[in-house]
Amino acid sequence: MQTRKPEHGPGVHDAAWRETKTAILLRMTLQPSATDPHPDLPICFAHPLDSDSEKLTTPEPNCLELPGRGPEIIYRTGLATLSNSEEFGYQLAAAADNRGFFTAQAQAYICDGQSYNWTIHRRHFASFVPILDFVHAAEHVHQAAHALGEDGERWVTCCWQGQVSQVLTEMTECLNRLTPPPDPSVEQEHPWCVLHRELGYLKNNQERMDYPRYRCEGLPLTSSPIESWVKQLNQRVKGSEKFWNDDENGESILHLRNAWLGDDEALQKHLANRPGQPYGRPSNRTQSCKAA
């Protein structure tokens, strides 16, 4: 979100972009299965969105229309802050504990692969199954294949079916056949640089890509709900002319927006019960205290 320096008069002073840390806590249906309920790769993951495949004349089934598509959301609440990742981890753990997540029958922690997300997992959510969002995994695999001038569908299918080690082996062989540029730091889009970068991403997240097991356990595979939540959050806090004070005011608007979006109706409850609200019944607590 865009921020400005407070207490400097009208207008925008020292404009800057601040990263918001966002998470959602979901209660979802759980339907474990003895066998993989969906072993075949959904067509929506087979090709990147910017490829010619999206121009196919024959409509393909949507991922949401496929059988065994995974758990459904029952109840959602969220959390957003301008704090650093360490403080955010404690805030998220407190929110999860308040909602009873640490006693849930099944527990999953899904994110996009950023290192600080896994640090939060290790510190606060070690009992949760760590899952790399499959959409991000597929995106990185497609980028690696594109750098080689190939279609990434086969590699993405291997990842979907739990054969990540095979993909890593083949990528390593391809990388060894390429000649690195004289200065990799300058030519970051060189095929060798792209493949080296994507290979490192997948190696770092390999242990969190056992997707067949997650499907059998009835766990979700993607962080799509948080992407949707962030878009709804940004409808209020982002805009070409929106600047928030870089202090508690900017933090407050994030809390208010999350309270409005959550299924627990936290904002509505606060407005209905806040001190001085005009529609509540007057309290006789003061009179009772005086009488005592």
Language model regions located:
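Catalytic center-proximal scaffold of phosphoryl-transfer enzymes
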Residues: 1-292
